């Protein structure tokens, strides 16, 4: 049976608590671990009269298991794991070292005094649906015709995933050369490692950038991939690594090195890239563009509807990927802010971001520090993080799943406050 579980912790070493729970779940009789999400931070659910000391943020994740255990046996096992990891029975909203909730048990609907499945809160809680949408976006839970991703988008509360940008290039538009010192990140750059995703690119796609061959690109990204593998060694709950490349050779080598996502700004124009992805289990970012590198003189007609163009383009390219055997749940669509759009068109796409959700694919925006902001600020790209944060807040409010940004720590600090005050 395929089982979905939600994990949460807001006491002690929260990430370690969840990792120990996952390891214990994987060790249950007749059980194997299939997929698990990255970590999302959320505010504690509290009653109005809860003590102030209960107000501790949670870390959350989702897990997919295959198990031969019966539902009540699995419930008993999860409760034993909670107890072993220090969970103390107390009042409903009190902090806890670990929560392990059985969200779905195959396609069964279960209602007993001990267990209700699907879990009663699964359809209304962002901290449950956001991690689930990362690993099983197209899954339909019993009792609903909507996918997990569609359910997530129906609730007002949003919980975006953060993607940190790692440009291992000497000429990127806002941070070129920052990661080249000793092939390792500086202390300040380590903040980029605290998100859900890390996107590593070895070729600049800024206007006027010069193409690089795959060997040069690989020499740039390989040391960072190796560093990250060592940095996260032994950790289950680690960011997923994305390789930002349009080279099939680089993509194949990165997949072999263990990346989880291939982010191709060319929109998988090279058939060889599609064949490589079809033979892998990686997710992929499908980005709209008119030219790579970006060309400010090559933009959509000023009198067109940019969303209509995007909907048509994504529809065609998703069909190409599906014919190649790539399931839609693996695809993340990116409208390509800065690639073939004027500033006005980019802002319109941001404002109408929800229209991109008709494809039932996760949506990513790479909007950080880009030229569309020039009409609102005169600072250089490397200083546009406050402006980027404002755009990120609006995209998150519109339900966009993944936000690709440079100043990850600034965004996370902002988001913690924004969640509490918006």
Regions found by a protein language model. Give the residues of each.
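N-terminal beta1-alpha1 ligand-phosphate binding loop
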Residues: 1-44
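Short beta-strand-to-loop capping motifs
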Residues: 9, 63-69, 104-107
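Short, charge-patterned binding micro-sites
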Residues: 35-66, 202-212, 293
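Flexible, gly/pro- and Lys/Arg-enriched active-site loops
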Residues: 45, 49-59, 72-158
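N-terminal glycine-rich anion-binding loops that anchor highly charged ligand groups
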Residues: 162-164, 191-202
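Active-site-adjacent loop and "lid" segments of alpha/beta metabolic enzymes
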Residues: 170-187, 205-230, 234, 240, ...
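Short acidic capping loops at alpha-helix termini that bridge into adjacent secondary structure
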Residues: 239, 328-330
